[in-house]
Amino acid sequence: MMKFDNSYAHLPERFSAAVLPTPVKAPRLIAFNRTLAEELLLDVADLDDDRLAAIFSGNVVPQGAEPLAMAYAGHQFGGFVPQLGDGRAILLGEVIDVNGRRRDIQLKGSGPTPFSRRGDGRAALGPVLREYIVSEAMFALGIPATRALAAVLSGDRVQREVGLPGGVFTRVAASHIRVGTFQFFAAREDDEAIRSLADYVIDRHYPDAKNTENPYLALLRGIAERQCALIARWMMVGFIHGVMNTDNMAVSGETIDFGPCAFLDEYHPNKVFSSIDAQGRYAYNNQPGIAQWNIARLAECLLPLLDPEVEKAAELANAVLADFAAAFPQRWLTGMREKLGLTTEEEGDMDLIQSLLSLMQASEADFTLTFRRLSHAANGDAEPFRGMFIDIAGADAFLTRWRERAGREGISDSERSAAMLSINPAIIPRNHRIEELIEAAVEDGDFEPFHAMLTAIATPFEERPDNFVYMQPPMSHERVFRTFCGT
């Protein structure tokens, strides 16, 4: 069924702990991503839903799997925790996909592990459905992210603040190695393990680094560059991760661990949704700086590999961090130019962009809908865009400046509009719609809203009558102000 080709399981014992999933009571398949299964070359065509539920709940361990929980540490909200690890997730193993890429297959909510820290190792149904929707939405938006392979209703109750139905989520990732994985060994001054891990990550994710003068510096630079690109993509769609701890940053460059994540409704640069982020550390506009901070923590782990001389190693690491700080504003500006349909660079572009963002903030304009309507305004239909703002005169002044700026580029209005419509989504996984589908599933056992939203987010740039409801911002009574981690 799965042709496992495991490598992480064969690293030294201190990298992980072998552990079997704990069976659940009555597994029932909620969703299975057959397109992804084909990409992973899984032989599942002849398996019915009951068999799939048994496998992807952990009740049946596939042949060739070497189940394990990974060891890692991490800075959580700025405070270092020397041992975290997979407390409710078990890596079944790795497969080679249709494109020759190595991919992890991991169960989340599959029972306790040696890293559970008194937890039950289980997942409530709500977080399972949230991660399935958001990870697939990110994929459809073209943003690197872990993928959803399966969601299973466990038949067990899990105790949180109240008793809730349990679920098991199957996650597919380029790998599950985190900044915190390096920190786990650095905290123990285990330079041998750090070198082994770095060599493994180079082989798996950054093979070009092997041919450079300083492969470990190239590794650090490669991770920093991917994170810089990733966070810029987040910002372009109003994504707020919510818990950017170092143990939630994947060195592969994929978005991972969706816990209390959310998307902007009305634009506010300091927006926070996560109930556990009381100080706003991981607010929308703070994400680039936090990413750089996390890379600095990774650099600290790699210092012994960068150069034998401490001062020289620090100099090399600081140069990477300086490059991140210089590169991100340019990536952000490039992304915003694209959202405004601008194909060239002019000195006044930043001021033009900031004038729009200021208008949006003052009117509490919806982030996604504003840029979608501006995309239509590029082809002459400006009234819906103007209707987003309290300050109509300000909106008109922006439109005049924007049209003058765009007019200097020599492409047609229809071409510009088409380009903008291809990058400014009509549909994101709206926070209130996610809460609705979770409530329907948890309270009523109704998974139709989940499947309907899953269909809608698969085509985020299409406007159709059947997905119109998913394009709409929340009404005042539908707004979500807080999201929860679910652990």
Swiss-Prot record:
Domain of life: Bacteria
Binding positions (ATP): G85, G87, R88, K108, D120, G121, R171, R178, D257
Cofactors demanded by this protein: Mg(2+); Mn(2+)
E.C. number: 2.7.7.-, 2.7.7.108
Residues forming the catalytic site: D247
Catalyses which reaction(s): L-seryl-[protein] + ATP = 3-O-(5'-adenylyl)-L-seryl-[protein] + diphosphate; L-threonyl-[protein] + ATP = 3-O-(5'-adenylyl)-L-threonyl-[protein] + diphosphate; L-tyrosyl-[protein] + ATP = O-(5'-adenylyl)-L-tyrosyl-[protein] + diphosphate; L-histidyl-[protein] + UTP = N(tele)-(5'-uridylyl)-L-histidyl-[protein] + diphosphate
Organism whose genome encodes this protein: Agrobacterium fabrum (strain C58 / ATCC 33970) (Agrobacterium tumefaciens (strain C58))
PANTHER family in the cross-refs: PROTEIN ADENYLYLTRANSFERASE SELO, MITOCHONDRIAL
Keyword Manganese appears in the UniProt entry: yes
UniProt keyword list: ATP-binding, Magnesium, Manganese, Metal-binding, Nucleotide-binding, Nucleotidyltransferase, Transferase
Family stated for the protein in its record: Belongs to the SELO family.
Enzyme superclass (EC): transferase
GO molecular function, one term: ATP binding
Function, in words: Nucleotidyltransferase involved in the post-translational modification of proteins. It can catalyze the addition of adenosine monophosphate (AMP) or uridine monophosphate (UMP) to a protein, resulting in modifications known as AMPylation and UMPylation.
Protein known as: Protein nucleotidyltransferase YdiU
Annotated residues for binding of Mg(2+): N248, D257
